[in-house]
Amino acid sequence: MEEESKSLPSKDNFSEWYNELLMTAQIMDVRYPIKGVYVWYPFGFSIRKKVYNMLRNLLDVDHQETYFPMLIPKPELLKESEHIKGFEDEVYWVTHGGLSELEVPLALRPTSETAIYPMYKLWIRSHADLPLKLYQIVNTFRYETKHTRPLIRLREITSFKEAHTAHATWDDAEKQVHEAMDLYSEFFTKLAVPFIVHKRPEWDKFPGADYTMAFDTMMPDGKSLQVGTVHHLGTKFAKTYDITYEDEKGERQYVNQTCYGISERCIAAVIGIHGDNKGLVLPPNASQTQVVIIPIIFKKDDGGVKEACQKVKELLRANDIVAVIDDADERPGAKYYKWEMKGTPFRIEIGPRDIKNNSVMLVRRDGKKESIPMDGLPETVRNKLFEFQTDLLNAARDSMLARVKACETLDEAKQQIENGWATMPWCGEKACGLEMENAVNCKLLGEAHTIKGAGKCPICGKATDRIITMARSY
């Protein structure tokens, strides 16, 4: 793989910057000969691995990981008519096995409800089997006809984490919805990705769900990116797939279900929100390497620099800080460029003067530089990593919230969504909501409990305390 050395386009041109960065930083190669299907570079995949291990650690507290087949028989996929209507024109079909036409066409999973729930029918017998909480991390396929974009809109989603739970009552399932939202909130906070949770409008909820809660973040161009969803399914799928349990009275009852998912869009959010004109800026929690140590050597006799670098690396690693030494035969400037492009949170420079002073030079990814004594170095670096993680989240959150504006007219909202999100009163009627979308040429993200207000619906004029968020979306 060739090492790129060119500079990136300005982030002000976000689309061009994003596409160039994915290749230059070796996150994802877009040159695979199928539209919307991309290849992870090893470095990009190391970020994916770190992020999804973090997600696994959160889920494994009270979920079990599993794996269901990718192929779904057509009759099973078509059982839930409302569900399949949501994406029937996006399904990939396998119609042949070798040269023989299959008696029953098989779908490549667009999502896994129709693969999982026939098995839940077999596995759930009594109230003692509940709650059942499973998840899997798999690839899914959608024949996207819109403009595809790596990590954001794909025909093969390579990293779809989907959890599926079953409960005795609707209220139990609702409690699980809130637990899932808490889990996702912790996950995105660890990624330093700010978000607002919206209850999707009725016409934009997950097909077959009672309601949908969505985690939305704002990309640098002001568009919203949906990075996670949590759905209360009620008994809709249980009735379709006959998933029942015997209660304490010996009577058969339908289970109530939830499902919730996150894809590699979470990594797109980290890249897009934090990156700069030098490359990636990774939160320490998401970076495979947290500190790179760079020896500064001026003569053939290194004056103990290499030995000092090795000592620092071992000291940091012994304290659970992921550090590496870059001892490649390159100028220090070339190494700075390389590790800045990779988004490494900190670099440590060690030269003869630092050894003499029993110190190291610590440089944060945003350029802040300070001399740090060797005494207590691991604790200092750990504190600096935490501080950087916190600063990234706070800066991103402040930037997002500063671009969410309450608007009084549709014309004002139309202007606002060019660079951010607009909020407006809404009566709650679908007809008014759709007219608002058409007038502003945007999407209604939904209602957020964190955004309060009151006013009159701009379409029908009714007084309301319901506030809707409007945005252009990926």
Swiss-Prot record:
GO biological-process terms attached to the record: prolyl-tRNA aminoacylation
Lyase as UniProt keyword: no
InterPro entries membership: aa-tRNA-synt_IIb, aa-tRNA-synth_II, aa-tRNA-synth_II/BPL/LPL, Anticodon-bd, Anticodon-bd_dom_sf, Pro-tRNA-ligase_IIa, Pro-tRNA-ligase_IIa_arc-type, Pro-tRNA_ligase_II_C
The entry's keywords: Aminoacyl-tRNA synthetase, ATP-binding, Cytoplasm, Ligase, Nucleotide-binding, Protein biosynthesis
Compartment list: Cytoplasm
Listed EC numbers: 6.1.1.15
Annotated GO CC locations: aminoacyl-tRNA synthetase multienzyme complex; cytoplasm
SUPFAM superfamilies, A to Z: C-terminal domain of ProRS, Class II aaRS ABD-related, Class II aaRS and biotin synthetases
Disulfide pairings: none
CDD domains xref list: ProRS_anticodon_zinc, ProRS_core_arch_euk
Signal peptide: none
Reaction(s) this enzyme catalyzes, per UniProt: tRNA(Pro) + L-proline + ATP = L-prolyl-tRNA(Pro) + AMP + diphosphate
SMART domains: ProRS-C_1 (SM00946)
Molecular-function GO terms, alphabetical: ATP binding; proline-tRNA ligase activity
NCBIfam families cross-referenced by the UniProt entry: proS_fam_I (TIGR00408)
Comment on protein domains: Consists of three domains: the N-terminal catalytic domain, the anticodon-binding domain and the C-terminal extension.
Described function: Catalyzes the attachment of proline to tRNA(Pro) in a two-step reaction: proline is first activated by ATP to form Pro-AMP and then transferred to the acceptor end of tRNA(Pro).
Subunit structure as annotated in this protein's UniProt entry: Homodimer.
Family: Belongs to the class-II aminoacyl-tRNA synthetase family. ProS type 3 subfamily.
Protein's UniProt name: Proline--tRNA ligase
Organism of provenance: Methanocella arvoryzae (strain DSM 22066 / NBRC 105507 / MRE50)
Species lineage: Archaea, Methanobacteriati, Methanobacteriota, Stenosarchaea group, Methanomicrobia
